[in-house]
A protein has these predicted regions:
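Charged DNA-binding/catalytic regions of mobile-element recombinases
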Residues: 1-289
Length: 289
């Protein structure tokens, strides 16, 4: 075990320093290093290459569950336990969460809708329940605001809109684009918080025009839009945290890449636990077939 620690830390300390710290001889270390690798060690080295490949391809986003599942789907022996150990030994950790303050402004006198979902975020068929929210992204040029519409049956991001201002026009654009992409479905429950943008006359007018049903979380209820908050959390951790955007254009490209290329479409790479570890689009395609 001590000799293995040497190998993992050679880039930080000289062999002489590590020998003194761990009270072992140089000759003993070099003798250990010259031995042929066991079958297990050789297998671990090959697995390590695959783990690093997946980890780098997904920009440090996935943890051990998604990496092990993806490698298993590729036909490679990659138990969760082995992946955890190898990632830990090499200091590879999925991107960690960072706290972000809320953007919702519920202090207004606009009409609000009742909470029809009541934390039931399961949908039995497509276009039965949608959820929406606004999140924000900092760039060196200032803030960007992202409005997302999420389909609860497949957890697919139906559509989204992004702007320098957090206005009613932003959420209206996201909803209109979602309607067009889904071929104008009727009777969809569209759930959001009680922010002034969602309570605006312009946004609520779309519900009348397109025969949608408005639903809103209760004021101060942090679980009222939990499915959307969960998506926001994943987005911030996997696409935003640790990134520095010099321009708004850089951030917009990152948003597009995450939603349209990574989250919605990549079959195995975006392993969604609630969908049996397949992508939202693959889940929908299987159900239709």
């Amino acid at each position: 075990v001590k000799y293995a620690m040497f190998k993992n830390n050679e880039m930080y300390f000289t062999v002489g320093v590590m020998c003194r710290l761990l009270s072992v001889s140089r000759s003993g270390y070099y003798s250990w290093r010259s031995r042929p690798l066991s079958d297990r060690d050789q297998a671990n080295q090959l697995l390590l290459i695959d783990i690093k490949r997946v980890f780098d391809e997904e920009k440090g986003r996935p943890g051990s569950p998604r990496i092990s599942k993806r490698l298993q789907d590729e036909g490679k022996p990659a138990s969760r336990h082995r992946v955890v150990k190898l990632m830990r030994d090499n200091g590879w950790r999925a991107k960690a969460a960072k706290k972000y303050k809320a953007t919702t402004n519920s202090n207004h006198s606009l009409p609000v809708a009742p909470n029809l979902l009541k934390q039931n975020f399961r949908a039995d068929v497509p276009n039965q329940k949608w959820v929406s929210d606004i999140t924000y992204i900092w760039t060196e040029e200032g803030w960007l605001y992202l409005a997302v519409v999420l389909e609860l049956y497949s957890r697919r991001v139906i559509d989204w809109a992004i702007s320098e201002r957090m206005t009613a026009a932003l959420v209206c654009e996201a909803l209109i684009m979602a309607l067009w992409r889904c071929h104008m479905p009727k009777g969809v429950i569209v759930h959001s918080d009680r922010g002034s943008q969602y309570c605006s006359a312009a946004y609520q007018k779309l519900f009348t025009q397109h025969q949608l049903i408005s639903s809103m979380s209760k004021k101060g209820d942090c679980y009222g839009n939990a499915a959307m908050e969960s998506w926001n959390h994943s987005f911030k951790v996997e696409a935003i945290h640790g990134e520095r955007f010099l321009t708004r254009s850089d951030a917009k490209y990152q948003v597009f890449d995450y939603i349209e290329v990574y989250y919605n479409r990549k079959r195995v790479k975006r392993l969604h636990s609630k969908l049996g570890y397949v992508s939202p689009e693959t889940f929908e395609a299987k159900k239709v077939a």
